[in-house]
Amino acid sequence: RRQRQMCIRDSSYGTNRENDLPDMIRSLKGRIHFAHVRNLKFNSDRDFEEAAHLSADGSFDMYEIMKALYDIGFEGPIRPDHGRMIWGEVAMPGYGLYDRALGAAYLNGLWEAIDKSSAK
C-alpha cells in the first residue's frame, strides 16, 4: 500500500535550522517513497543559498543524511535536487546538468561507502 507516502526533500525541511534531517528521515521509516537530496549554505538564520552537494560546501552533513536513508532500508529513487549553473552552462535556472550529474555521482559514492562500511 502506498498511502501516505512522501517525498523527502532535505533542502525544504532543512531551511528550518531546528530540524534534525537525519532524525526526521529515521522517524519516517517506511513512508519515504522518493528522496530529493542536496546541500544548502546558510548565510544567516533566514538567508541561505543552494550549494554544491559536498558537505564541506554547505551547512548539511550529507553523509549523515544518506546514512539515515540507508539505515531505514530506503530502496526508492534518490536524485540530486536542482543544480547550479557551472562551467559556463546555459540551461533552465536550477537545473544545470553538470552540477546535477556531479551531485548524482557524489550521492552514489556516499551510498557505496556507507554500504561497504556497514557490511563489515
Each PLM stretch: what is its role?
Residues 1-2, 65-75, 107-118:
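A structural motif corresponding to the C-terminal end of an alpha-helix
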Residues 3-8:
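Short, small-residue-biased leader/transition segments that mark boundaries at the very start
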Residues 9, 33-34, 108:
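Glycan-recognition surfaces
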Residues 9, 37-38, 81:
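Generic beta-strand/beta-sheet core signal
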Residues 13-75, 89-101:
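Gly/Pro-rich active-site loop or hairpin
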Residues 77-84:
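Short acidic/histidine-rich active-site segments
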